[in-house]
Amino acid sequence: MIGPSSQISKILLTLLFLLIIFYVFMDVELYLRIHNYAIERNYHTNVSLPASVVGPSTSESGSGSIGGSSSSSSSSSSSTSTKLPTAGDRQPSYEDHTWISCDINPLCHVTVKAILLDHTNHYLFAPLATMFDNVIGFSRSTFITPNMISFFHVGVACLAGKLVASDSLGYRRLGVLLFQIRTFLDDLDGHVARVRKHIRGERSEIGTSGYYVDGLCDGLGCIALLLGIFFYLKNNPPRRGYSIIPMSDSKLPEPTMMIPKMKATTRKVAKNVISFTGQLLLSSTAWNRYIAVYQNMLEREDVSGNQSHCQDYVFKSTWFFCVAWMWRIVNVHALLHCVLLSIFCDKLWDFLRAIRYSGYIILLVAICLTEMHILEAQNYIFNSTACSNISL
């Protein structure tokens, strides 16, 4: 599947399975962390929490935990699938119970963006970016800015795209590794920007100049990769079947339609690459929209104490976790990881053909389910009587 050396293939395949098992294990740990520990709302390291967000009274130990509710409020929220937590369900802080430093622990600061982020960026690149910055000190440097890192990884992506277009499988694999380095640098520039703004955890600063610069650089990097994919497939058109070997020595007439046939192959390559590009655009647009919507709905602080408890209730619901997990595997970063894996395994054309139509169906289903959840959650938090009748 991966190359002529069976030993290397077995090692790489084993590493892939171990990585998948690690992702599943971390997802289970993330689910348990969300349900068993308080959700920290203070995302700024130098800002104290408002009283309405910390909890209903200072005598209670759980900061940022789910609020209590009386039996009457449970009955008024009968439109939801489960009842609200009671006052006795105050939850401890995760920071006080984990043995891994929250500086590198991806489960420590749980935010909307962290839950919607793909597994590789959340569990691997984000902690690695933190450790790399702790050693090199980019966030403490006044010379290097996050935007400089963003522009630099565009150059890395261009080099990766050039290698991906190569006829050599070894160079294409090197291009895959370079593009993953670009993804790591993308995590690094976000980490440096958040550290300088004293923001803990993953969070999108929507509307800032850095947000748009980072988006522009990410788009340019994806374009470089897609161009490399197109030129590789154009120069190495996939075979449609086995060549027919003549049984006699008689010379066959030369084919007269070679040029039109090559044009048809190029058009087919272009259609598949354009189809995948459309999926990346659709996934990126929807994913960034839902990060903005959920951040505004679940992490805003200009709400009443009752609404704050309902925000925590929605955040901890299994329905929201399922919606978020769905986007972890269909967002633009996950799609890029899949196409990079197909390039590394020399299965690029098979992947593009398999996802040409099914990818759109999966994305549309994910969008419809997410829109339904958003409408239900917004109505529950801001419009229903369940939140207004919670007994604090």
Swiss-Prot record:
Bilayer disposition of the protein: Multi-pass membrane protein
The UniProt record lists the keyword Transmembrane: yes
Gene encoding the protein: Cpes
TM region positions: 11-31, 141-161, 213-233, 272-288, 320-340, 357-377
Protein name: Ceramide phosphoethanolamine synthase
Topology feature Lumenal, residues: 1-10, 162-212, 289-319, 378-392
Entry function: Catalyzes the biosynthesis of ceramide phosphoethanolamine (CPE) through the transfer of a phosphatidyl head group from cytidine 5'-diphosphate (CDP)-ethanolamine on to the primary hydroxyl of ceramide.
Organism of this sequence: Drosophila melanogaster (Fruit fly)
Gene3D superfamilies with a match to the protein in the record: 1.20.120.1760
